[in-house]
Regions:
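N-terminal binding-site loop/beta-alpha segment at the start of enzyme catalytic domains
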Residues: 1-84, 144
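Conserved short secondary-structure transition element at the edge of the structured enzyme core
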Residues: 143, 230, 238-282
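Glycine/proline-rich, positively charged
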Residues: 26, 93-189, 193
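A cross-domain feature marking catalytic cores of carbohydrate-active enzymes
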Residues: 20, 56-58, 88-90, 122-125, ...
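Conserved, mostly hydrophobic/aromatic
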Residues: 6, 18, 39, 54, ...
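Short, well-ordered coil/turn segments that N-cap beta-strands
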Residues: 11-16, 50-52, 79-84, 115-119, ...
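Aromatic-lined glycan-binding groove of carbohydrate-active enzymes
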Residues: 189-226, 262
Length: 282
């Protein structure tokens, strides 16, 4: 396993971040999640392979149970908390990043994860109903209290990222060091403005959906996976762009066949060729 420093932080992370959205108790919107036994198997295998970077959220699995499940797994398989880097997120449970919500949600996450701190605390989306000054000040309080080591953001626009970091800079607060946005061979919107901003801010990306929800791993088929039968987010992201995606997917297949490797490796090689990408969430 190769490791990389996460942006301007001192976090040394594996170049693969294990996404933990698939772990947790099933719910109406997440009927495909894996139980504790299956979670243990995957977490143990990841650790054995040298993966030390894990990404979850307070809303993954019913009642935030992804955090609970991986917390249980870490208790079983991790001897020293410093050996792993845990990222979790805040917003969806309460739909906001007000001070009250942030303070409640971090305590809930820490309890479920069975840890005293998280290494990277990410705002899951922008909160249009509360001032970003309130959000950044509250997040800074978490850093000062040592409940959180570093801050990140997810799925926000470049102007929002710059605004948040400039406000933090003006007040001497902790800034966002990384962003987790949607980015892969068939979705490259971030190349319009976000990438240039990341380079100027000396930030890094930990992109999600590096495989395009599996679309970059095989030739296109109209037969849906279990997740695509039930997950409105996955359907929304890719179903409408099928005709645009298929030529790219076919080209990935051609390259994979020529190199005698899997399509997934081609998609990953493309992601890893980008200097602003630290570790894709897989």
């Amino acid at each position: 396993m190769e490791y990389i420093k996460l942006g301007k932080s001192d976090l040394k992370v594996s170049k693969i971040c294990l996404g933990c959205m698939s772990f947790g108790e099933k719910s109406k919107s997440l009927p495909w999640t894996l139980d504790q036994e299956q979670t243990d198997i995957i977490i143990k295998k990841a650790l054995d392979l040298g993966i030390n970077f894990f990404d979850t959220a307070n809303c993954y699995g019913a009642n935030g149970s992804s955090e609970k499940f991986i917390g249980n797994s870490f208790k079983k398989f991790v001897k020293d908390r410093k050996d792993i880097v845990i990222a979790t997120k805040v917003r969806w449970n309460e739909g906001k990043t007000s001070k009250e919500a942030i303070m409640r949600e971090i305590d809930g996450s820490l309890k479920r994860l069975q840890t005293d701190y998280v290494d990277l605390y990410i705002i899951h989306r922008w909160d249009y109903d509360h001032p970003i000054e309130e959000t950044m000040e509250s997040l800074n309080e978490l850093v000062k209290s040592k409940k959180v080591r570093y801050l990140g953001c997810s799925s926000i626009f470049p102007y929002q990222l710059l605004k948040a970091n400039m406000i933090a800079r003006q007040h001497g607060w902790a800034e966002f060091i990384s962003i987790q946005n949607h980015y892969n061979l068939i979705y490259r919107e971030e190349e319009r403005e976000m990438i240039q901003l990341l380079e100027e801010e000396k930030m890094v990306m930990t992109p999600y959906s590096a495989m395009g929800a599996g679309r970059l791993c095989r030739l296109y088929t109209d037969e849906p996976t279990e997740r695509f039968k039930d997950d409105p987010n996955a359907i929304f992201k890719y179903a409408q762009a099928k005709d645009l995606d298929i030529p790219v997917i076919k080209r990935v297949k051609e390259v994979a066949d020529k190199m005698k490797i899997s399509m997934a490796l081609v998609a990953l090689a493309w992601i890893y060729s980008k200097p602003y990408v630290a570790a894709p969430v897989l």
